[in-house]
Amino acid sequence: MMGGLSSEKEVSLESGRNIFSKIDRRKYDPVPIFMDSRAALWEIPVKLLMRNSTRDIEEDLEEEAKPIPYETLKERVDVVCLGLHGKYGEDGCMQGLLELLGIPYTGSGVLASAIGMDKYVCRRILEISGMDVPRTIPIPRSRWETEKSCVKQEVAQRIGFPCVVKPCREGCSTAVKKVVSAEGISDAVENAFHWDNLVLVEEFLTGMEVTCGVIGVDAPEALVPSETIPTDDVLSLQDKFLYGQGENKTPARLPAEQIEKIRENAVKAFRALNLKGYARIDMFARNDGRIAILEPNTLPGMTPSTVLFHQAAASGMTQTGLIDRIIQFALEVHAGKRGPL
């Protein structure tokens, strides 16, 4: 399932195409399902799947594709391989709908997906679990509108500069800004409020940004971690997913003991957040040796160039093999559930 309503729908299309291309056809009969901008589902032919953008696909849905009412989805598929990203795709909304329909799906469940999308709630859980996280101040829109000067003073005193400003519930570095002085706070916060009613201001970490995939259900295992090398101070969506943008080094250029520490922290975060199937944990190897957890990505990009496939290859898995394991984890989770679903 690909497309959707979020700012990441073009990446979702790339993920869906790649999953469709790389899935093991000896075991599975893939059905490309596209979610349009009104959240309607369509079974699309390959010629539409290969279009350049979601807009190009939507132009010919009525003539070329077959609508799939949600209530009949279970008659068409045995498991949904989620290629959706961002709001309404990886925030628990689609997961909840699939639970109601009784259809197995890849990735984490409703609550874990919702928590993973909310950076502040996620960070609080990780902190309570004893993990290192960046110092963070949450700013609700209502407080910003009535106490702007107090908020700016609190940022200067508790966080300092440079700092990072971001929407609380958006993925892939949407509207994330590095602010180097007090003069830049207002513009960055106002911009972030275009995306969410809750904005986070956090400390700007120094060291090496790393990311580590984790797969599994009851016994999760960490893949080989990667060093992420941004084209700017903050990783963009293009850095994370698209061809020729940004750079990853797998494995990360760190001592073996530091690599193992990163893998251990990734699994610990995966467990603390009750993630399932697969996820990518973004972290920072601080200059003092500590590993700070930034956030999880509960439905990592599955584009051909995504870092998750680099890590799988370094761990001895092909793209087809990783996709197969992710689907099997989905079936395992579904089989372990109790009740009518």
Predicted regions and their residues:
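ATP-binding N-terminal substructure of ATP-dependent carboxylate-amine bond-forming enzymes
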Residues: 1-111, 115-117, 121, 128, ...
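Active-site "cap" helix and flanking loop/linker of ATP-utilizing ligase/carboxylase catalytic domains
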Residues: 227-279, 307-341
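A glycine- and small-aliphatic-rich helix-loop capping segment at beta-alpha/alpha-beta transitions
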Residues: 96-105, 181, 186, 314-316
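Phosphate-binding site of ATP-dependent enzymes
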Residues: 177-264, 285-292
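Hydrophobic beta-strand scaffold residues
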Residues: 30, 104-105, 133, 163, ...
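Conserved metal-phosphate-binding beta-hairpin within the catalytic cores
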Residues: 203, 213-214, 270-302, 312
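Active-site nucleotide/adenylate-binding loops and adjacent lid/helix of ATP-dependent enzymes
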Residues: 1-2, 6, 14, 70, ...
